[in-house]
Amino acid sequence: MGSEQSSEAESRPNDLNSSVTPSPAKHRAKMDDIVVVAQGSQASRNVSNDPDVIKLQEIPTFQPLLKGLLSGQTSPTNAKLEKLDSQQVLQLCLRYQDHLHQCAEAVAFDQNALVKRIKEMDLSVETLFSFMQERQKRYAKYAEQIQKVNEMSAILRRIQMGIDQTVPLLDRLNSMLPEGERLEPFSMKPDRELRL
């Protein structure tokens, strides 16, 4: 009974394989099956003169730091891989750290000098600003006084116009008075100018 079942199991996979046909997805097209409708204009193009290809050829190649460790690369087990010396890497890192420390000190020194200079400039600007404010207040007072002078000048001009209109009337009125009651001729000039 057990031998019959094992013989049946062995014969079944062969029967399945013989009846199954390969799927069309697995069937690959051959070059004879491809029909080219039009060749196109790419055939006449010269690849060696293509600027993109020239730029790609000018790119330098780079090798990894540890050779033999590229992805997908298989190396024999007995091949000795190149390794970085830890002491040299440590010395490189310490030297780089020292360089960064020196740069940081130089930047901090320059930064402190700039902060000090900025504070000095702020103090100078504040002093200058207060001085200019005081000067502006003084000039505002001067402007008020000049405005008052202008107002007084306008008032004096109006007074002068009134006097110029009044003096002829006084002369006319004085000429109408009798000889004994007439006044001296009215004049706005000082006595010294009249005597000269």
From Swiss-Prot:
Tissue specificity comment: Ubiquitously expressed (at protein level).
Phosphoserine modification, residue list: 71, 75
Keyword field: Lipoprotein, Lysosome, Membrane, Myristate, Phosphoprotein
Domain of life: Eukaryota
Entry's Gene Ontology cellular component terms: axon; BORC complex; cytoplasmic side of lysosomal membrane; intracellular membrane-bounded organelle; membrane; plasma membrane; synaptic vesicle membrane
Keyword Lipoprotein tagged: yes
Any one of the GO BP annotations: regulation of endosome size
PTM annotation: Myristoylation at Gly-2 mediates attachment to lysosome membranes.
InterPro entries per record: TBORCS5
Topology with respect to the bilayer: Lipid-anchor
Family from the record: Belongs to the BORCS5 family.
PANTHER family, A to Z: BLOC-1-RELATED COMPLEX SUBUNIT 5
Protein name, UniProt field: BLOC-1-related complex subunit 5
UniProt gene name: BORCS5
